[in-house]
Amino acid sequence: LADACAENGIKLVGPSADHMRQMGHKIEARALAAKAGVPTLAGSERVGSADEAQMIATRIGLPVMLKAASGGGGRGMKIVTEVSQLAEVFTAASAEARAAFGDDTLYLERYIANARHIEVQVLGDAHGSVIHLGERDCSTQRRHQKVIEEAPAPNISDEFRDNIRTAAVSLASNIGYEGAGTVEFIADQDKGEFYFLEMNCRVQVEHPVTEMITGIDIVQEQFRIAGGAPLSYAQSDVTINGHAIECRINAEIAAEDFRPSPGTITAWQPPEGPGIRLDSHCYEGYTVPMFYDSLLAKLIVTGPDRAQALAAMNEALRHFRIEGVGTTLAFLRHAIGDADFASGKVNTTLVDRLIREMPDEGPPTI
């Protein structure tokens, strides 16, 4: 699309085709991050066979993760804990990558067990300016896909926060990035270090939490940048006020391994009130198809601090009524009320425990 727009004299509101290609290919993106001085995980270039993967995994040290070079959305990613698994996992990951992306190229990275997923929102213009709008924590995930996001990231030091923001700006500046983008990192909580994961050259699903605490309309900035205007803000203009949390409400039954639940919505009563934002396409009578992503709504709540934002989110989820399809509302209420989540002790495996401990609320209201 970006190429077609350029060839026909149409200005795409978004980054260039070259940047999309560079960051869309994870191996090239890793190389560009390293060139910009951004830490990267021990890993590999393209892995051509299971035997080669075994050799690299032995050098890096287990566990490792096999990843699709053209991947995204959690597809084409497999954790390997034993060398004996590699042949089978390599075949499965390459087949999944080929089916999802038309490219079965794989690479290896060291796997971090006690990890957090922290990302930084950046904006860049055609005049060489790049700023960040702070970071988000997106560690609460199922199948490598985000479920709850919040900003700013809790339980990190000021030094860590400054360093991860600086790294994101460094990468975007180094490649001359124009538009809104998100630089994603994996944080090793045991070592207190972070590593480049990928860069998404678009507005993220979770961008509202950043908008709510900065007061900056990211989409409006995208249009201004596309029109050739300089950024509306210098870095010194960006201030973080309060705390925002976003819950993704999906048509899925969490207790059944997040099984999709298509159907017709027979009741739709979202919460309302100060500090509540709802981004959704749904309404009573809407039919949720079986063919597309299961996201029904993004519920965003803002408070003066994290504790008050959590309390407000708990209330908002409690008053959200959806019938006709199974949803993740019960799971989200359970997650927000969890002691570890409430204290900010999160990692990318938290959802696995939450599902095991989730109380039985009976069948969903369908």
Segments the model singles out, each with a brief description of its role:
Residues 1-183, 187-204:
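N-terminal beta-alpha lobe that positions the nucleotide/phosphoryl donor
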